[in-house]
Amino acid sequence: MRRGNRCLGTSTNGEDSYIRTYAADPVDTQLWKLVGSSDNFQLVNQAGQYIYVSDVPTQVTSGGENPTPLAAGNTQQEGGFSLQEAPNVTNGTGFELVANAKSGNNVANMWGGDYEGTTIGFWQTNDVNNVMYFVKPEDMTYADYKSAGISGYVPEHKLTLWYTLPATTAPLYSGGQGYSNWMEYSLPIGNGQFGGSLFGGIAKDEIQFNEKTLWSGKNTDNSAEYGDYENFGSVYAEDLSGLFNYSSTGGAANYYRQLDLTTATGKTSFSTADGSITFNREYIASNPAEAIIARYTASEAGKVSLRFTMESGKPGVVATTTYANGEGTFSGKLQTVSYNARFKVINNGGTLTTTDEGVEVRDADEVVLVLAGATDFDPYSSSYISNTAGLSTLVQSRVNDAANKSWNELYDEHVADFQKYFARVDFELDGTKNEIPTNELIDSYAKGTGADALMLEQLYFAYGRYLEIGSSRGVDLPSNLQGIWNNMSEPAWNADIHSNINVQMNYWPAEPTNLSEMHLPFLNYIWNMAENHNEWKGYASAAGQNRGWTCYTENNIFGGVGSFMHNYVIANAWYATHLWQHYRYTLDKSYLAKVFPAMLSASQFWMDRLILADDGTYETPNEYSPEHGPSENAVAHAQQLVYELFSNTLDAIEVLGNDANVSEADLADLQEKFNKLDKGLATEVYDGEWGTSQISSGTSILREWKYSTFKSGQNGHRHMSHLMCMYPYAQVTPGTELFQAAVNSMLLRGDGATGWSMGWKINLWARALDGDHARVILNNALTHSNGGAGVFYNLFDSHAPFQIDGNFGACAGMAEMIMQSVSDTIRILPALPSAWNSGHMTGLKAVKDFTVDVTWENGSATCITITNNQGQTIPVLYKNLKDANIYVIGNVQEPVTVDEKGVAVLSGEPGTIYVFDFDGSHKPTGIEAITPKQNTDVNIQGNRVSISGKDVQNVRVIDMQGRTVKSTSKTQFSLEQATGQALIVEVTTTNGQVSTHKIAMP
């Protein structure tokens, strides 16, 4: 069939006799001949089956039934078939198949839509799903060689996505929705700016690549030249070994492909059918090398034979590749940026030949491919480009520099660079095993809460951090709606920078999951566009303001904007709060001083724009609550954002002091408007309009609009824009009426959502201190996408289609279940799901630059370790904190005490470590483990301590904070100040033996 380029055939396993669409395969049931004349013929396949019109209806996946499907069997079609030229064929010639004896609609049609596995029914002429064409068997191309998956494989590292089918032949969801092998199965690698998508093909291995700055379009406002994030192109490695073919016996065995998140390495492995030779292909996107590198090897010497070619990402990127000296390159120019891509092949053994058709390697032991690409985009140039003349030299130098190193050197520096970020955090749920392919892991996820389900959740958290590192380093631009990965010239929503939640959500995990450096490309983009370019200042002017800056919902990388909702000018406030958030986690005062002018000018925009309402509060004029309901003054979304902006700006002024350089008039105006600002925290009473299955009538909910009721919106809408106060901010306090009203609003909205919306809801329910409800949303998010929200088999989040923000939202939400600190208190296990019975999460970051490790068993903490990186003071809250033994490693002014609410205030010098040990497993620094058999005994009478045993040389008494209370050579001594304390007594004998005893003073 012309649409979808699929072949007609019958089931090869005999499950039914219907004619369906299949991926091309050289099997007898797809090879057809026409017997008769062009106006009266029969269709018979090589298996001897005739096509006929059945009168037995069949159900259609997309709904309904096909009343007269085509089937195959021994019956010839009465009256035969004829062909007529298809009208309005846009991509090549084609025909319509007509059932001559059928009345009414008699043209064969893909029934129910264009997707693999659809049956063929009958419809009227001139439908796009009618058109078919014929190809000779010798001219047919196939997706890939056949392959048999490996058995009993377990990846080296648990945090690995793995599969036993290539992306080239894996089945797609039958409902269509624009799904592709790329979206469903390709595996992403990225160095933060330059990335690739891996398919694991055998006959023709594809690395489809992207570069974050390759955009069409210009810096214009609301024009047809807005542009798209473009597919850069693909490099192919075609198998020339002669060891495989497309027949059922000529395929590969022992196949698997994987993405190891621990090392950020892709891999494909397969063997010949008899298992005698194994081929391995490994892939990295190296930040140090600024290139993608692949290595192709075989288990026997001289068995690697490949042809390398490269194609630009047509139709958006149209360029011709030229080949010379083992390299291929193409270049060109879009409306603003110029681009250049180059690869180089390095062979170890065998021969290398370059022709006009590509680079061929024959009989090599090893082949290394180096791929680099770049544009002349420069975010700090007024024209957004620079050094166009040097672009080719830049890309060539990256290729040459990498080619001059061995694979092992490139791999080692890549892994070391990646792991210094990725290894900071470790999340483990007890009992998890990664023993089944990831697509099967997803399919089995809905079956329960066992080890497989927990493994998928653990993997999904790690994947979010992996994608953050892979998409947000290098150039000062944020990751877009798809991170940096895209295989289309016109992707959904242009794969742009969406400012009404999506780009912000991309960075929700950055600070709390200890990836502050990955936040910087977004933050520097905000500062640069606000301070150094004119577009955002122009949008502020267009909104009627003489000071400040703003942007709209849809943004390209040149400051250009789309047409959607130009009255959404509150994005500047949301952006500016990210600048402050980075300071809260890092305490980088020089950074704050740099970006503060952008915070101040955003505040000035709103200081000038706010209007005084009749109730005496300041309101934002004519805003709307994304993406529904009326536009009006004082919508809760905008009010909460301005409140956070003003609060952050005032806090920054306090930190910077005179360095803030704020005029007295501005400071007074800011403070006055902050004090009188409508906070967007009004409530209304739900009247049961949308039913009472979620909440009952008479329940208090937060108002989304100040002057319109909740009925102005849509029931179950995907945005929760009036709940900024709950997440990402902390404007409502647990235990208060406003907090409960916010929770009620969440209940009313329901659990249904798009992919990114579920990412938000996971965070909201974690902030609501309801871990089980948060996990319900996580369960929904990890359901395989069959046309709607969920995940694809490569764990890409599905809106649908693919949007990466949901990956990041879920990652942040899982961290929120274990630790929260946005309210300036470290809350331990605030929303632990009951299914996460035992596990640990280490390396999380809290505000004020504290690092937090938590281990728990049976739903309760067993050890909490908190590191005070910069000598700050912060409360820590955990319900059972009073039950812990407390150890302090470092100098503190006062002993750590816990109040009746489970709160301890932590203070100390930089580097101080606090350990809250609940099960006695912690071993203080410098203290030997306490063993049940001791060479010495300790007796206590009152405040007197007596040591019995031979040859006692020294006795040291240590409190539970790791401090030495007493050191003596005496075997009897008093502890005057130790009443009621638990202590460690360390006894050293003359022969060097050490015994330790835990004692409790009366």
Residue ranges and their predicted role:
Residues M1-A143:
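Lectin-like carbohydrate-binding module/patch detector with strong preference for beta-trefoil
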Residues D39-F41, I292, T862, Q872-I874, ...:
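Structural beta-strand segments of beta-rich domains
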Residues P87-N91, D127-V128, F134-E156, F918-Q934:
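Low-complexity, Pro/Thr/Ser/Gly/Ala-rich linker/spacer regions in secreted
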Residues T141-F564, Y583, L600-S603, A613-Y618, ...:
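Aromatic-residue-lined binding/catalytic grooves and analogous aromatic/hydrophobic interfacial grooves
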Residues N500-E511, Y568-W580, H637-N648, S721-A730, ...:
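Well-ordered alpha-helical segments within folded domains of soluble proteins
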Residues Q581-T586, S590-Y591, A602-L612, D666-G713, ...:
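Non-catalytic carbohydrate-binding regions of carbohydrate-active enzymes
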Residues T620-A652, L656-G657, F802-Q803, D849:
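C-terminal, helix-dominated tail/subdomain
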Residues G890-V892, T897-D899, G926-P1002:
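C-terminal outer-membrane/trafficking sorting elements
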